Amino acid sequence: MSKNIWAELPQGFTILAPMEGVTDVVFRQVVAKAGRPDLFFTEFTNVSSFASEKGRENALERLEVAPTDAPIIAQIWGKNPEHFAELAGALEGLGFAGLDINMGCPDRHVNAAGGGAAMIRTPELAVECLRQARAATALPVSVKTRLGYTYVEEFREWLPVLLREKPAALTVHLRTRKEMSKVPAHFELIPEIVRLRDSVAPETRLVINGDIKDLRQCRELAAQYPEVNGYMIGRGVFENPYCFTEHEPTVEELFGLFRLHLDLFDAQDMKRLAETSEKMREDPAFALKMDGKVRGLPFEPLKHYFKIYVAGFPGAAELRARLMECKTTEEVRAVLTEAGH
């Protein structure tokens, strides 16, 4: 029987929120170097992609972990209960401390596929997916969701549906799907959410998410709401990659972290190239699917991170503009060196 990582975390624990195209295996190593949270989450992995021959390779790449990740939770999404069971059963051997079902992502494509926040509208299906996942694994199963789909008041009916299933943890983003991140998080509802948890599933760890920027704010919230067990930081990491510490980084420390990110990206790229090349040699069908081309990591998504490191000093915008014209990590390093960083 696997340990319940949620029961081992300290009161007031911190989590890096799962963010599509952000919290991959490379960036998590950067955050770990700056100052890691108590718990990491992966990016979202679609259960039906894992269940298909065509999509499994990509799903497994999303689930890759580094030694510095532990403990880490695999976050998964979808709407097919059997596929939830299939992926949940495979996760035990991949180094995860648990799995989390996303029932809160507001992305319209995810919602159109019946996943993420769309599950708020299909509570019976949501419960069945949760049950199937839990039955297939000894890992603790948790859920991340929102207050509701359209109206804030939905939480009074929606959260008890989940809590009655006794998930290991429940993370509540304090907004609705309709609100996205356009309005302030509804911190005023925390006491009522706590009462719901205490009355329905007192053993479930409660995590709050939304408008939480750094460790200092986590501690302030912990003092105000001592019954909440943990806090999840998402976009705050873009403002300060040291957000899980009390350290205020200097400009040069941020550039040092930037160069580390580039090095880790290159290492992951080389690893992916080697793995793909080996598989193509061993599997002619896979080589045919790849058109005989060995592909590493795409460079363009790396540019999403530049604003984390290059901000808050005179000339930052101009330097970022130059960096955005780069096409390789070597070009990025050359621009940084020329700029004196």
Regions found by a protein language model. Give the residues of each.
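Alpha/beta enzyme core
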Residues: 33, 85-99, 103-113, 124-206
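Alpha/beta catalytic cores of nucleotide-metabolism and tRNA/nucleoside-modifying enzymes
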Residues: 1-10, 14-15, 20, 26, ...
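Active-site beta-loop-alpha junctions enriched in small/polar residues
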Residues: 19-21, 45-47, 77-79, 104-106, ...
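N-terminal small/glycine-rich loop or linker at the start of catalytic domains
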Residues: 9-13, 48-71, 105, 110-113, ...
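Short glycine-enriched, charge-decorated loop/helix-capping segments at active-site entrances
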Residues: 114-120, 179-180, 247-248
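Conserved phosphate-coordination/catalytic loops
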Residues: 78, 120, 124, 184, ...
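Hydrophobic faces of well-ordered beta-strands that scaffold small-molecule active sites
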Residues: 14-17, 40-42, 72-76, 99, ...
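Glycine-rich, positively charged N-terminal anion/phosphate-binding segment
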Residues: 2-4, 19-93
